Amino acid sequence: MGASLKDIACKLNLSKTTVSWVLSGQGDKKGISAETQSRVLACARSLAYEPNLLARSLNTGVSKTIGLILPSISDTFFAHIADRIESEAEREGYSLMIAGSNSETERENALIRLFRSKKVDGIIIAPADASGREVGRLAESGCPVVLFDRGLAKTDAGCVVIDNEAGSHALVRHLAARGFRKIAIITTFPHLPTMELRHRGYLRALAKAGLHADPRLYGEVAYAGYRQHVCDTLDRILATVPDTDGFFFTTHILATEAPVSYTHLTLPTT
């Protein structure tokens, strides 16, 4: 076990309070001499002292830790974002606690409560709960919250998102402009605002092109076991509407599964 504040204080014949102030960076503010501060720091190094971060956060109200909640840690999209967030956090002197919600509301809410109990200084989250109740309570409590990828209409938290409706509208309009007329949509988590907006963009693009939104060309995939579900959904659509000539996937995870089982098909990819 490493040395404690008491060990350092006894060795230097100082009070624990003085040692604590120096090690927490408050030496100058508390009027402690430069010589005493140097002695404390040197002693801490020689005794391999490691601060109790939880105790420090309780005393100062600052943990220098940010909680990050992702829908999926294994998803390359979110993994890349986590990597960039961690780099920026480290640049500012913060460490990151990362957890995955599996896009499950109950798990997400439990993680929010867990991070709060760990006294994190803020939480960054791609929310799974479309109601935003727990995130809303978090924001109201005064804890800094930033949403990304998925916004919540009833929450005042800061949010970083793209224009999902405009993006999907442009993509489907591009397919229609190339002459494709029976464009299917494959989606997941339809309750999420992000997916609702992408579906809305799809429907708007079809209407703009004078195309009928055929319900047979709609596929909804459960995330659990999505690999098989994507193939089953494609089978069902192609069996029902054999002349389907285009597919719009609302997320890259679904899109990357299609070529695996359908390399023999000639379908638009741009």
Language-model-detected regions and their locations in the chain:
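Bacterial carbohydrate/catabolite-sensing allosteric modules
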Residues: S46, S87-E92, R116, A139-L147, ...
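N-terminal helix-turn-helix/winged-helix DNA-binding helices
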Residues: M1-S4, R45-F77, I81-D83, R91-Y94, ...
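Short, Asp-centered acidic motifs that coordinate Mg2+ and/or phosphate
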Residues: G122-I123, G246
